[in-house]
């Protein structure tokens, strides 16, 4: 067993790569399972050795890729606390939030040979849980859209400004009123703990979605 800092072997980049790929798959799957877009724009693929649904709509795919491309440098620096997929009704009020809480330890005690395969097994369990989450959630009203929120540590603000210039992709400070839900129902979906990453996924669901 070897103890490394996050700077050794550029391990922050490895974690960011793994998380970015996972979050891309997760966002596509959430949009499919929660029927935010017609099922016809999705195709079955295989990720983490399980079948998943991925969008084949170019503009939607580009938005998701651009978003996560800008999140990746923040993940690399361990500046991300949460990534939230918010599903909004026609009035742009949130009806559901899929919250990925992410914690990366400053010291990594790892066996590098088995590291990635172990993490991928844990991420597979998240994907399987998302695939069946509609069983514990109420139906959403028609005409929903979505957005992605990133909760960062305070020190990340300057990094985000730099990323905006480099990536030409505008981050906008979220208005708490726009994304707030009064007394939502909390549904825990999955938690993982590994040597390089701790992550928790839960859903906040609005009590009366059609009102």
From Swiss-Prot:
Q: How does it assemble?
A: Homooligomer. Heterodimer with REV3L. This dimer forms the minimal DNA polymerase zeta complex (Pol-zeta2), with REV3L bearing DNA polymerase catalytic activity, although its activity is very low in this context. Component of the tetrameric Pol-zeta complex (Pol-zeta4), which consists of REV3L, MAD2L2, POLD2 and POLD3; Pol-zeta4 is the fully active form of DNA polymerase zeta. Component of the shieldin complex, consisting of SHLD1, SHLD2, SHLD3 and MAD2L2/REV7.
Pfam families in the record: HORMA
A molecular function GO annotation: JUN kinase binding
User: Quick one: which gene encodes this?
Assistant: Mad2l2
Q: What name does the UniProt record give this protein?
A: Mitotic spindle assembly checkpoint protein MAD2B
Question: What job does this protein perform?
Answer: Adapter protein able to interact with different proteins and involved in different biological processes. Mediates the interaction between the error-prone DNA polymerase zeta catalytic subunit REV3L and the inserter polymerase REV1, thereby mediating the second polymerase switching in translesion DNA synthesis. Translesion DNA synthesis releases the replication blockade of replicative polymerases, stalled in presence of DNA lesions. Component of the shieldin complex, which plays an important role in repair of DNA double-stranded breaks (DSBs).
What positions does the domain HORMA occupy? 13-203
Mainly localized where? nucleus
The answer to whether UniProt assigns keyword Cell cycle to this entry is yes
Q: Which UniProt keywords apply?
A: Cell cycle, Cell division, Chromosome, Cytoplasm, Cytoskeleton, DNA damage, DNA repair, Mitosis, Nucleus, Transcription, Transcription regulation
Stretches the record annotates as Mediates interaction with REV1 and REV3L and homodimerization: 21-155
**Cellular compartment(s):** Nucleus; Cytoplasm, Cytoskeleton, Spindle; Cytoplasm; Chromosome
Q: Name one GO biological process term.
A: positive regulation of DNA-templated transcription
Domain of life the protein comes from? Eukaryota
Q: What does UniProt give as GO cellular component?
A: anaphase-promoting complex; chromatin; cytoplasm; nucleoplasm; site of double-strand break; spindle; zeta DNA polymerase complex
């Amino acid at each position: 067993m070897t103890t490394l800092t996050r700077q050794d072997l550029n391990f922050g980049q490895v974690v960011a790569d793994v998380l970015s790929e996972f979050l891309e798959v997760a966002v596509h799957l959430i949009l499919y399972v929660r029927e935010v877009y017609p099922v016809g724009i999705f195709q079955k693929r295989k990720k983490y050795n399980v079948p998943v649904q991925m969008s084949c709509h170019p503009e939607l795919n580009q938005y998701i890729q651009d978003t996560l491309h800008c999140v990746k440098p923040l993940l690399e620096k361990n500046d991300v606390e949460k990534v939230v997929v918010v599903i909004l009704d026609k009035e742009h009020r949130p009806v559901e939030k899929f919250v990925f809480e992410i914690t990366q330890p400053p010291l990594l005690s790892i066996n590098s040979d088995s590291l990635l395969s172990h993490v991928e097994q844990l991420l597979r369990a998240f994907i399987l849980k998302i695939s069946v989450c509609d069983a514990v959630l109420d139906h959403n009203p028609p005409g929903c859209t979505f957005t992605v929120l990133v909760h960062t540590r305070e020190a990340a603000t300057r990094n985000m400004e730099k990323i905006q210039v480099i990536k030409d992709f505008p981050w906008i400070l979220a208005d708490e009123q726009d994304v707030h839900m009064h007394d939502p129902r909390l549904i825990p979906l999955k938690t993982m703990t590994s040597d390089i990453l701790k992550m928790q996924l839960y859903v906040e669901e609005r009590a009366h979605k059609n009102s």
